[in-house]
């Protein structure tokens, strides 16, 4: 459930946002943003409304935008900011977003929800979006049983860490590391 918390609410008690270090502020903002994106995912996983573009695809697209933007911002801060503590906070933030991305791609309830959306009368771009989205879920291993999905999750996380460790960037930014599938 969305707690409605904002970054300022997560600041240490007795301190204003101005008293918080830039690294701590980034960590607070990241946690808030990842929490907001996670709420969207959980709402979609529990969604019982009409399976149409407005009810399913728009919130899913918002989730994708939040995750992609968050990964990009964290990656840039991690690579170029002169403050080591802030770079570490950005690295931790990037990891949170990438974990959420993996969780999203392996969410069977979300996959099944998107698969139920009738796009037969939608425009060709929407139809293609759904086609590619479902393909990406399948490549991630969403159709496998829970034990294999857990293994996929572990392998994908390991691949992302190796990719980052080699300075190859993140897959969201065009890293040449391939996420293994089963």
Residue spans for each PLM region:
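Zn2+-dependent metallopeptidase catalytic domains
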Residues: 1-182
């Amino acid at each position: 459930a969305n707690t409605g918390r904002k970054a300022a609410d997560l600041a240490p008690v007795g301190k204003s946002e101005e008293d918080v270090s830039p690294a701590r502020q980034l960590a607070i903002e990241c946690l808030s943003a990842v929490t907001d994106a996670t709420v969207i995912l959980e709402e979609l996983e529990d969604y019982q409304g009409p399976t149409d573009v407005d009810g399913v695809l728009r919130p899913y697209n918002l989730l994708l935008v939040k995750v992609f933007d968050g990964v990009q911002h964290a990656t840039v801060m991690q690579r170029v900011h002169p403050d080591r503590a802030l770079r570490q906070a950005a690295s931790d933030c990037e990891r949170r977003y990438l974990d959420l991305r993996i969780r999203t791609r392996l969410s069977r309830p979300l996959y099944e929800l998107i698969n139920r959306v009738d796009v037969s009368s939608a425009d060709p771009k929407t139809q293609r979006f759904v086609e590619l989205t479902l393909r990406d879920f399948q490549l991630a291993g969403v159709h496998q049983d829970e034990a294999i999905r857990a293994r996929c999750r572990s392998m994908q996380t390991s691949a992302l860490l190796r990719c980052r460790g080699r300075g190859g960037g993140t897959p969201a930014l065009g890293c040449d590391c391939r996420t293994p599938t089963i």
